[in-house]
Regions:
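Cleavable N-terminal export/targeting peptides
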Residues: 1-23
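Short glycine/proline- and aromatic-enriched beta-strand/turn motifs that initiate or cap beta-hairpins
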Residues: 19-65, 154
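Flexible, solvent-exposed loop segments that connect beta-strands
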Residues: 24-29, 58-73, 98-115, 155
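Outer-membrane beta-barrel "beta-signal"
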Residues: 77-79, 117, 122, 143-155
C-alpha cells in the first residue's frame, strides 16, 4: 500500500515538472460506485495530456466494503471526441483490484488484474475547475460496471 501511494505521488510530481502549458495537467477527486454490488469508493488521480486529444489518467480508488478492505489502481488512456465546455471522451486501460477479507492476517490479499473500458464527460465550469462523470466496465470477475462522479482542478 505504501509503495502504491509513493508511486502515485512520484508520478504526480514528474507530471508537474514536465507540463508547461495551461490545461495540460488536471487533478481529480471523485466518488466511485459499483452498480452491481452497491459498493462505494473514494477516488483520486490525475490526467496528463501528452498529445492532441489524448491523455494518460492514472487513479487510485479505496473501496468501503461491508467486510474487509479493498482498493484498485487504474492506468487509463483517454481519447477526447469533443472540445470546448463539454468534453466527451472514450476511456480504456489497465486495472488491478486488491481485496482482503481478513485485514491484519498475512497472505490473505487477493489480487485481480484486468482491463477496463468506457465513456466519460468533463464539464468545464470555470477557468481552473470542472466536473467529471465516467462510466466504465472492469473485466475482473463479473465485469463490474463502475460509475464515477467528481471534481477536477486544472493546474
Amino acid at each position: 500500500m505504501k509503495k502504491l501511494v509513493f508511486i502515485l505521488v512520484l508520478l504526480i510530481y514528474c507530471s508537474l515538472a514536465t507540463a508547461q502549458e495551461q490545461g495540460d495537467f488536471r487533478v481529480q477527486i471523485a466518488g466511485d460506485y459499483k452498480l452491481q454490488i452497491n459498493d462505494l469508493g473514494g477516488n483520486a488521480g490525475f490526467e496528463y495530456f501528452f498529445a492532441d486529444r489524448f491523455s494518460f489518467a492514472p487513479s487510485f480508488t479505496y473501496w468501503f466494503p461491508d467486510i474487509g478492505r479493498s482498493y484498485s489502481l487504474n492506468a487509463d488512456l483517454r481519447y477526447y471526441l469533443t472540445e470546448g465546455i463539454s468534453q466527451v471522451y472514450l476511456v480504456g486501460g489497465y486495472n488491478n483490484f486488491w481485496l482482503n477479507l481478513q485485514p491484519g492476517e498475512p497472505g490473505q490479499v487477493l489480487s485481480r488484474a484486468g482491463a477496463n473500458f468506457g465513456v466519460g464527460a468533463f464539464l468545464d465550469l470555470m477557468d481552473q475547475f470542472g466536473v467529471v462523470t465516467e462510466f466504465k466496465l472492469q473485466s475482473q470477475n463479473t465485469r463490474q460496471p463502475v460509475l464515477r462522479v467528481g471534481v477536477v482542478f486544472k493546474l
